[in-house]
Amino acid sequence: MKIFFSGSIRGGNKYRRQYGQILAFLQAFGETISEHSDRPEAFDDGGLKGDAAIYARDTHWIREADLLVAEVSQPSIGVGYEIAYAEARNIPILALYHVGAESPMSAMVFGNPKITSIRYDSLSELWPVLKDTLAETHLPPK
């Protein structure tokens, strides 16, 4: 299973440290094809030249994905766009939301029946729920 992980980069990096832990967890279930989200160079566009190159790279990765997992605790137009892009291509979507986040989550995400939303208080609380949810996706294993 190919997993595209989406998390705020330019919109804020409060949850950046958690991205790495979530990515490491997801690697047990498949190939993560967007690990750039937890690397410092991602905040400098990962060495790509210009916004068009980043758009082309990320949309290519999403089209290649079997699943999109988005950490949505930090509001981000880019993450919302990636979610909509995946939805338009019938790619399953999991949205992870930290209940202690400063901003409430958009009803456009939590109200969407095509998106599986998981609220969590701590990463240790998230792991078993995420594991069970990934098992229920019935996507090809790693």
From Swiss-Prot:
Pfam families: Nuc_deoxyrib_tr. Monomer and homodimer. Its EC number is 3.2.2.-. Belongs to the 2'-deoxynucleoside 5'-phosphate N-hydrolase 1 family. HAMAP family: Nuc_phosphate_hydrolase. Disulfide bonds: none annotated. It catalyses: a pyrimidine 2'-deoxyribonucleoside 5'-phosphate + H2O = a pyrimidine nucleobase + 2-deoxy-D-ribose 5-phosphate; a purine 2'-deoxyribonucleoside 5'-phosphate + H2O = a purine nucleobase + 2-deoxy-D-ribose 5-phosphate. GO terms for biological process: deoxyribonucleoside monophosphate catabolic process; nucleoside metabolic process; nucleotide metabolic process. Substrate binds at F4, F5, S6, G7, S8, I9, R10, Y19, H36, E82, S106, A107, M108. Catalyzes the cleavage of the N-glycosidic bond of deoxyribonucleoside 5'-monophosphates to yield deoxyribose 5-phosphate and a purine or pyrimidine base. This is Putative 2'-deoxynucleoside 5'-phosphate N-hydrolase 1. Keywords: Glycosidase, Hydrolase, Nucleotide metabolism. Signal peptide: none annotated. GO terms for molecular function: 5-hydroxymethyl-dUMP N-hydrolase activity. Transmembrane segments: none annotated. It comes from the Bacteria.
